[in-house]
């Protein structure tokens, strides 16, 4: 399964966010899922990439190359982009060229998809993901969450977003969504498009259900 991840690229944030992100990244690798993310080497993006890499190594899915890069011991998934439980996954980075030129691209990627701007990045992240998980993040993460949710409301796709509510991070957004719902501003119910996982076990159960 391809799991899209939206998250912060900032380093100066609470330690708990890194701990839970690391746990999730390792779980994805050890269960053969692929991750599709923004491909940055900073903040939670860098954390999930490193955790995925270490999870792959511990699960004996990969060997380490001489330069520390991932060398897979078998062919990648379908067209090099698909992972599923019991198969070898990929760490797929959708990286704007401006990020790459700035030296902020993760060196743990097994698949690199370049793009020209953030709009293209969002389209590609969604296209290559089966389900999306939003970890703590700022303006960019909110932009991605609402872009995917808005597209779902009018029928462009049926992919679910899961807010991983680490340390109650998403509580204020949940309250806003409830308020918008009460005011009649959301087509249907926001929970038709967005789920909330308040624990790691809830998160993995939701992902497993989507598989």
Indicate where each model-derived feature is located:
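Arginine/glycine-rich "motif VI" loop of SF2 helicases in the C-terminal RecA-like domain
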Residues: 151-159, 185-186
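A cross-family phosphate/adenosyl-ligand binding-site feature
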Residues: 1-77, 83-128, 164-211
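Glycine-rich anion-binding loop/nest that anchors nucleotide
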Residues: 36, 132-138, 160-165
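Active-site/ligand-binding-proximal alpha/beta "capping" segment
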Residues: 119-153
């Amino acid at each position: 399964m391809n799991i899209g991840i939206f998250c912060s690229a900032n380093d100066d944030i609470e330690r708990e966010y890194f701990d839970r992100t690391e746990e999730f990244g390792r779980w994805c690798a050890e269960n053969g899922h692929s991750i599709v993310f923004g491909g940055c080497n900073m903040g939670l993006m860098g954390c999930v990439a490193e955790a995925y890499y270490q999870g792959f190594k511990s699960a004996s899915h990969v060997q380490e190359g001489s330069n520390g890069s991932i060398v897979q011991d078998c062919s990648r998934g379908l067209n090099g982009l698909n992972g599923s439980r019991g198969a070898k996954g990929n760490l797929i980075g959708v990286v704007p060229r401006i990020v790459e030129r700035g030296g902020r691209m993760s060196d743990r990627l097994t698949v690199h998809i370049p793009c020209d701007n953030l709009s293209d990045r969002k389209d590609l992240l969604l296209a290559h993901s089966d389900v999306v998980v939003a970890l703590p993040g700022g303006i960019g993460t909110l932009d991605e969450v609402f872009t995917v949710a808005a597209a779902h409301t009018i029928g462009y796709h049926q992919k679910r977003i899961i807010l991983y509510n680490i340390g109650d991070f998403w509580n204020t957004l949940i309250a806003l969504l409830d308020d918008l719902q009460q005011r009649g501003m959301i087509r249907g119910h926001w929970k038709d498009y967005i789920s909330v996982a308040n624990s790691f076990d809830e998160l993995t159960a939701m992902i497993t259900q989507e598989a």
